[in-house]
């Protein structure tokens, strides 16, 4: 059973301290899976509909982050959630603009929140 991204975010945003930064027009999409992706070259493994979470461990520039978001959009991911505070400390305005212009929902979650807890909640 899949849920809309809007429903999932509404049910989990307080518990996991999620903040939406962009892409409101894409919230109607269904989530097929919550996918942790650290190797940004592996977007070919996506099937579509994934809410992709990353810590940004392999993202070392604004251009790389933008290219990652564009690749997620091409692969029809339903959203991007950045686990911020360790590898990613600042969200570029260019990323926020890109996600808004392309209806790709963009969220942040503090580093102190365990990614596995969010993934488990979706699975249950």
Spell out what each predicted region is.
Residues 1-124:
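Alpha-helical/coil-rich non-catalytic "connector" segments in signaling and regulatory proteins
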């Amino acid at each position: 059973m899949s849920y809309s991204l809007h429903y999932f975010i509404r049910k989990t945003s307080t518990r996991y301290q999620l903040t939406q930064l962009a892409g409101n027009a894409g919230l109607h999409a269904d989530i097929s899976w919550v996918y942790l992706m650290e190797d940004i070259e592996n977007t070919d493994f996506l099937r579509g509909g994934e809410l992709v979470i990353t810590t940004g461990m392999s993202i070392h520039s604004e251009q790389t982050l933008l290219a990652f978001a564009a690749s997620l959009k091409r692969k029809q991911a339903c959203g991007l959630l950045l686990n911020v505070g360790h590898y990613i400390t600042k969200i570029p305005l260019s990323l926020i603009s890109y996600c808004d212009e392309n209806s790709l929902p963009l969220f942040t979650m503090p580093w102190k929140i365990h990614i596995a807890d969010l993934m488990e909640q979706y699975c249950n």
